[in-house]
């Protein structure tokens, strides 16, 4: 792998993880805030709120995982390496 | 005065009654555990189905990679569920330890030639159809 490809892959990996984690991070924070407030207001609905939060977190965090996988593939299994 | 205090303490107050509060929180956690178990069961069913199809069409190595990915997906979901379960009680944030699972999966597939990357990633994402089915079947 030549040096330009290596440098571009490293920069792209950083951007993929960094930019890909911004949206899910904000979303997870606001979802957790809403869930904790909801549990504090309605403790009897804790199980349902936690379940919905778990499903939402799993969906949101998969976006981070996509960026992470792209970054790891670029770093360790680069398809552009000659 | 003292007898009045003793009488108040011995009366059935739901806020002071540890057993009753434990049982109600047990019902709530039971609901949460039941959801986790339903997703786990659906993921296992999808895993068995997908591993069978992959083994039939693409061979043993692809199905083994799919199985490893699916197992790591189940482990990831278990870690995420544990983090969400702790939120608000013993922890103020949801941990990010579960993100190590896909990292280790990709690193393992780049290190070991027996583990294919694409089937392993597809197997890892098998928990998502289970989540979608679960989400659609929620009342």
UniProtKB/Swiss-Prot annotation, chain A:
Protein name (Swiss-Prot/TrEMBL): ATP synthase subunit c
Origin superkingdom: Bacteria
Keyword Transmembrane helix in annotation: yes
Lineage, highest ranks first: Bacteria, Bacillati, Cyanobacteriota, Cyanophyceae, Synechococcales
Keywords on record: ATP synthesis, CF(0), Hydrogen ion transport, Ion transport, Lipid-binding, Membrane, Thylakoid, Transmembrane, Transmembrane helix, Transport
Known function: F(1)F(0) ATP synthase produces ATP from ADP in the presence of a proton or sodium gradient. F-type ATPases consist of two structural domains, F(1) containing the extramembraneous catalytic core and F(0) containing the membrane proton channel, linked together by a central stalk and a peripheral stalk. During catalysis, ATP synthesis in the catalytic domain of F(1) is coupled via a rotary mechanism of the central stalk subunits to proton translocation. Key component of the F(0) channel; it plays a direct role in translocation across the membrane. A homomeric c-ring of between 10-14 subunits forms the central stalk rotor element with the F(1) delta and epsilon subunits.
Annotated family: Belongs to the ATPase C chain family.
Localization: Cellular thylakoid membrane
The protein's assembly and partners: F-type ATPases have 2 components, F(1) - the catalytic core - and F(0) - the membrane proton channel. F(1) has five subunits: alpha(3), beta(3), gamma(1), delta(1), epsilon(1). F(0) has four main subunits: a(1), b(1), b'(1) and c(10-14). The alpha and beta chains form an alternating ring which encloses part of the gamma chain. F(1) is attached to F(0) by a central stalk formed by the gamma and epsilon chains, while a peripheral stalk is formed by the delta, b and b' chains.
Stretches that traverse the bilayer: 7-27, 57-77
Protein source organism: Prochlorococcus marinus (strain MIT 9211)
């Amino acid at each position: 792998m030549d040096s330009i490809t290596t440098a571009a892959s490293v920069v792209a990996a950083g951007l993929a993880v960094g930019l890909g984690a911004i949206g899910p991070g904000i979303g997870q924070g606001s979802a957790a805030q809403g869930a904790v407030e909801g549990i504090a207001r309605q403790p009897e609905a804790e199980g349902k709120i936690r379940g919905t939060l778990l499903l939402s977190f799993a969906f949101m965090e998969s976006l981070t995982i996509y960026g992470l996988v792209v970054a790891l593939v670029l770093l360790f299994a680069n398809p552009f390496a000659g | 005065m003292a007898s009045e205090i003793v009488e108040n303490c011995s009366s059935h107050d739901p806020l002071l009654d540890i057993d009753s509060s434990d049982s109600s929180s047990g019902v709530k956690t039971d609901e949460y555990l039941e959801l986790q178990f339903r997703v786990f069961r659906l993921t296992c069913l999808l895993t068995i189905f997908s591993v069978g199809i992959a083994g039939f069409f693409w061979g043993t190595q692809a199905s083994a990679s799919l199985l490893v990915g699916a197992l790591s997906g189940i482990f990831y979901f278990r870690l995420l569920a544990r983090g969400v379960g702790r939120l608000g009680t013993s922890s103020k944030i949801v941990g990010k330890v579960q993100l190590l699972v896909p990292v280790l999966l990709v690193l393992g597939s780049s290190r070991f030639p027996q583990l294919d990357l694409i089937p392993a990633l597809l197997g890892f994402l098998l928990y998502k159809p289970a989540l979608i089915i679960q989400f659609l079947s929620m009342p």
